[in-house]
Amino acid sequence: MGIASVVVVGGGVIGCAVAYYVAKRGLKVTLIDQPKRGRATSASAGGLWPLGESVGLGCGVIYYKAVAGMGTLPDGVQGPGQLPRTFLDFAIRSNAMFPQLSEELCEISGIDIELERTSLLFLMYDAGDEAFAKPLWERCPCGKDLTEWLSPEELAKAEPAVTRAVRGALRFNGDDQLNPYRLADAFRAAARNLGATILTHTEVTGIRVESGQVKGVETAAASIPCDLVINAAGAWASEIGRMAGIEIPVRPVRGQILGTETLPKILTACLSTTDCYVAQKGHGEIIIGSTTEEVGFDVGVKPAAMKTLSAGAIRAMPFLQNVHLKRVWSGLRPGSPDELPILGPVAGLDGYLNACGHFRTGILNS
């Protein structure tokens, strides 16, 4: 096997995106797709929510509600609204790239990522929700340019299927959605069409380092010499890091998700509440998520989570009590101590880059 200038480890959306951008630069790249169950792409509804997530009112609000009952947040976890302004700027810029990226990927790969300009609505059921959201909204760096405070009447007009038992909603107009599976497939196919080598069902067994320089990647099938390895292994990034002699603080965080039967279009925006998020995809399925669980690499689905998420979705959209669930599944998000991605080189190790720890924002930041 010839020399691969760049080897990307990880076949989720981040790994496929990295391989695409490297191939687009004309470099020789090999993408190693390890056979791992439950990678983060499968735990995503495909939300592009730079504003909602940055201020703590995206799907992360479910987690914050849970830990609030404990009195304090776990060590190393920031509270709502405390993600750095630099991350918000980064996320907004990333989101703004998607319309052009969608066209580009469709042209190169032939795959439509089903980008929809939807907005995100945070529903406020009671005074507690309102008190929680208002200061975050008031401190939002983008101010009133990309956000709106909707009255119950305005919400009912915008989304007739949403419950009337609300005090209002906060709308983030710059937050959208796409199909996460099609995004990963499009990045992968586009990378291949630009010359990337894709190794599927290939287990990485080691990273060869000599005198502080990465020299190659070992797999069960072959040794692949390279000048640079990029660790995009998602929840398994720590394992890959240790093969290179470094420690990366990435851990698996399980998210369980529900999907309904196909329905006519009844929801335009994506919904976020303190119970769940709800998003209707282009093909009619409604996605309901998501738990945030520290259970290691367990990708099982639990009846208790299904019940809790279902109740939250019905509270947001009473119509759903008469709708059948079609599927349930889970995925492992790559959590980091501060919920921010871990990117770039590592001191003392040449030829190695991290592209991991994206937690809930891997789709957005791909």
Question: Where are the regions that the model predicts?
Answer:
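Glycine-rich phosphate/pyrophosphate-binding beta-alpha loops
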Residues: 175, 349-366
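Short beta-strand to alpha-helix junction loop
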Residues: 89-92, 122-132, 170-189, 300-305
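Helical element adjacent to the flavin cofactor pocket in flavoenzyme catalytic cores
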Residues: 169-228, 236
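Residue-level detector of alpha-helix initiation sites
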Residues: 12-13, 235, 360
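Short loop/edge segments at beta-strand edges and connector loops
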Residues: 33, 151-152, 200-202, 327
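N-terminal Rossmann-like FAD-binding beta1-loop-alpha1 element of flavoenzymes
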Residues: 4-30
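Active-site substrate-recognition segment that forms the wall
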Residues: 17-24, 34, 46-53, 60-80, ...
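Dinucleotide-binding Rossmann-like beta1-alpha1 core, especially the glycine-rich loop
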Residues: 47-154, 312-314
